[in-house]
């Protein structure tokens, strides 16, 4: 994320779609690195269709019409948006992303999508107008965290080649040169790479391809729907509003600290992720826990995954 920001956003007008704490990270990177101060942030909000549930209101992204209008007004060089926001379980639909792309391209800018938490919900960069897609070996790919993955179309590559990064180690243009050398059968050096981790990642990609990428995508949605159904049966409310619920990261409300911190689940032998703030103006009482449904092991054993979770949840709630 920082490599992309330092290469493409330095002293530029930027617009950020912030749906939670991990898209707040764009703001942290821009401020800490003094990359640009010309930034517009559009935050998630309580959905119009959210019924009266006290403090447990469901969130949705800024309306796409508002985002498009802001892009047309501010004319950003870069729009940063999260496909899936890990803190909220919010996922941007394909059509939402396409409209972002169309809008930013109409003013000469680039669309950068953070797909680190997408799981196996693959995005078609060309069809959706994504210029830069960021991912990582962990989570959906089920591999060892060791590097950042930056995929770029021709427009993004052209912009990288005509800009200068403000970092040595995270110089995206330099790493693009390194990658090209390897693609052409050569070798180049900029910094020592995590070779073992990268080879493990290569093997995991091959494993996923052998299973079938479309099959994994379908499995991701099926698993997410079944886990959400279990939660709904226990009257546990999703933070993400209907239509924006990610199948790979499910975030739900709780009033119990031991569930919020994950300790209640750990006592039943189940590891989950503790809740984190959204940084979108949510109330101080905001308290959640998060379920990461990543991993080839889960996607190839959906019924077993759902059964183990349901059994643990019932013991936690007993």
Model-predicted segments: where are they?
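Conserved C-terminal alpha-helix-loop-beta "cap" of PLP-dependent enzymes
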Residues: 232-304
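Internal helical hairpin/lid segments
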Residues: 12-16, 193-263
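Active-site phosphate-binding strand-loop segment of PLP-dependent enzymes
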Residues: 51-119, 132
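Active-site C-terminal subdomain of aminotransferase-like
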Residues: 138-229, 297
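Conserved beta-loop-alpha segment that forms the PLP phosphate-binding cup at the N-terminus of a helix
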Residues: 1-28
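Active-site-proximal loop->helix
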Residues: 25-37
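Conserved active-site segment immediately N-terminal to the catalytic lysine
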Residues: 126-138, 148
């Amino acid at each position: 994320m920082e490599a992309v920001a330092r290469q493409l956003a330095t002293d530029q007008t930027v617009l950020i779609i912030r749906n939670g704490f991990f898209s707040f990270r764009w703001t942290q990177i821009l401020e800490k690195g003094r990359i640009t101060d010309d930034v517009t942030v559009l935050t998630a909000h309580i959905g119009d269709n959210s019924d009266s549930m006290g403090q447990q209101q469901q969130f949705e992204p800024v309306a796409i019409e508002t985002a498009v209008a802001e892009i047309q007004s501010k004319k950003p060089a870069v729009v940063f948006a999260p496909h899936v926001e890990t803190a909220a379980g919010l996922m941007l639909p394909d059509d939402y992303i396409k409209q972002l792309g169309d809008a930013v391209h109409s003013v000469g800018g680039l669309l950068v999508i953070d797909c680190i938490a997408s799981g196996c919900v693959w995005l078609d960069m060309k069809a959706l107008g994504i210029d830069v897609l960021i991912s990582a070996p962990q989570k959906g790919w089920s591999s060892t965290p060791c590097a950042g993955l930056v995929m770029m179309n021709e427009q993004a590559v052209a912009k990288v080649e005509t800009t200068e990064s403000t970092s040595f180690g995270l110089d995206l243009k330099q790493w693009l040169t390194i990658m090209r050398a390897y693609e052409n059968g050569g070798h180049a050096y900029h910094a020592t790479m995590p070779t073992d981790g990268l080879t493990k990642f290569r093997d995991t990609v091959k494993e996923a391809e052998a299973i079938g990428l479309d099959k994994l995508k379908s499995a991701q949605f099926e698993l997410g729907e079944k886990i959400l159904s279990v939660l709904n049966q226990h009257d546990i409310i999703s933070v993400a509003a209907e239509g924006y619920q990610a199948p790979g990261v499910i975030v739900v409300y709780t009033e119990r600290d031991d569930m919020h911190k994950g300790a209640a689940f750990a006592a039943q032998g189940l590891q989950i992720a503790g809740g984190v703030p959204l940084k979108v103006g949510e109330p101080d009482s905001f308290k959640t826990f998060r379920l990461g449904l990543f991993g080839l092991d889960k996607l190839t054993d959906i019924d077993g995954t759902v059964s183990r979770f349901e059994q643990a949840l019932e013991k936690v709630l007993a």
